[in-house]
Regions:
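Conserved N-terminal phosphate-binding loop of PLP-dependent enzymes in the Aspartate aminotransferase
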Residues: 1-405
């Protein structure tokens, strides 16, 4: 939809949003009207260099032509049914995902938080059915983030964070331990613990990758204690971190893994994959969804996954991510650069505010975001080049210099 075809102005659009929408977002003051590859364009055709990819969604590029074509083709065949009949996109995507990442079964959802809800439910049901009614406890990481629905929100180890404040008591059955502290996780487990649930990189927590010792230690500890290892790959999954799934960087395999974002290439979809044994916890009636496995979303996801794999965008994420980090480390006021592939966080010293850098970059037509007082995060499409990174670094440097004045 183009603004010129509506007879409205950009201010009219903003007025309608302010009047009718419940706003929980700090809006950027521009209209995203069209997009292609590494750029988003406003109503005047002004390009914005996209280093956020719709929050790690558009990994094969904005409006990837093969994804767009898959959506158009599927819309003309069948847009929606329910999960009683079989559909071709569901079946083909299930095979592609499971065979690619080495898991046995998949269950479709609509989003990342729903995928994490399903993962929590499956783990608890598995524990209760196999070991008895008290085996439902799950240990998660402090400063993690798993979503905004009640189970996922309760699993988020940030008591007092805005996503938890004001909603009353959290769902019972979770404990939190410091990230990358293997012994603390072991100590947090009890005889009632059925699972440990972590992100391989804490994105919202400031872009902190897990250590090899931590991830391999969790896998070993879970194996030794009849516990499940749940890995949240909503943000890290599908080539973002230099491997198809981030857990592959650690040479381990989860019992259940959640995914969303990049899986759909811009269409809403989430999923969990599980081992055959754990997947048996779900049977008819134990979980369900109206829109999960939507034919159009599955068609888009299949096209997106094929693009990511055929173009080796995991390899590009590793190569360009290392290059980008090396350039960012040379900027003034940079305290630390943390990254895994193209999930990149830059922490500045106390004189530079992350939000100030974010807004300064927006003024210079670069889209990034801020997390924490002095941290910016960048999650560009995985088609990004070293030249794109050079442009971004130059804009960030110019912004930093303007904040020194």
């Amino acid at each position: 939809m183009k603004l010129k075809d509506t007879g409205l102005t950009f201010q009219d659009i903003k007025d309608k949003v302010n009047k009718y929408m419940i706003e929980t977002y700090e809006r950027f003051d521009f209209l995203a009207e069209t997009a292609e590859d590494m750029y988003i364009y406003d109503e005047n055709g002004t390009p914005y260099l996209d280093f956020y990819a719709g929050i790690a969604v558009n990994s094969a590029g904005n409006c990837n032509p093969k994804v767009v074509a898959a959506v158009k083709d599927q819309v003309e065949d069948i847009m929606h049914t329910f999960n009683y009949p079989y559909t071709i996109p569901q079946a083909l995507l299930a095979e592609k995902v499971c065979e690619t990442i080495g898991m046995d079964k998949i269950f479709y959802q609509n989003s990342g938080t729903e995928a994490n809800e399903a993962m929590i439910k499956m783990a608890r049901k598995y524990g209760i059915e196999k070991y008895g009614p008290n085996r439902y406890h799950i240990v998660t990481a402090k400063m993690g983030f798993h979503g905004r629905t009640f189970g996922a929100m309760s699993a988020t180890g940030q008591p007092g964070n805005g996503c938890q404040v004001g909603f009353g008591p959290m769902t019972y059955g979770f404990s939190y331990a410091p990230y990358n502290d293997l012994q603390a996780f072991k100590d947090a487990c009890t005889e009632n613990t059925i699972a440990i649930m972590v992100e391989p990189v804490q994105g919202e927590g400031g872009v902190h990758p897990a250590t090899m010792e931590f991830m391999q230690g969790l896998r070993k500890f879970c194996d030794e204690n009849d516990m499940l290892l749940l890995i949240d790959e909503v943000q890290t999954g599908w080539c973002r971190t230099g491997a198809v799934m981030s857990y592959m960087n650690y040479g381990i395999k989860p019992d259940i893994v959640s995914m969303a974002k990049a899986l759909g290439g811009g269409m809403p979809i989430g999923a969990i994959c599980a081992t055959a044994e754990v997947a048996k916890a779900f049977s008819a009636g134990s979980h369900g969804t109206t829109f999960g496995g939507h034919p159009v979303s599955c068609a888009a996801a299949l096209a997106e996954v094929n693009e990511l794999l055929d173009r080796d965008l995991a390899g590009n994420a590793k190569k360009v991510g290392d290059y980008f980090a090396s350039k960012l480390e040379k900027l003034p006021h940079v305290k630390e650069v943390r990254h895994q592939g193209l999930l990149v966080g830059v922490e500045f010293d106390d004189t530079i505010g992350g939000v100030d850098v974010k807004h300064g970059c927006l003024d210079r037509k670069l889209l990034i975001t801020a997390i924490g007082a002095h941290i910016i995060r960048m999650i560009p499409p995985l088609i990004v080049t070293e030249e794109d990174c050079d442009k971004a670094v130059a804009i960030i440097e110019d912004t930093i210099k303007s904040l020194e004045k």
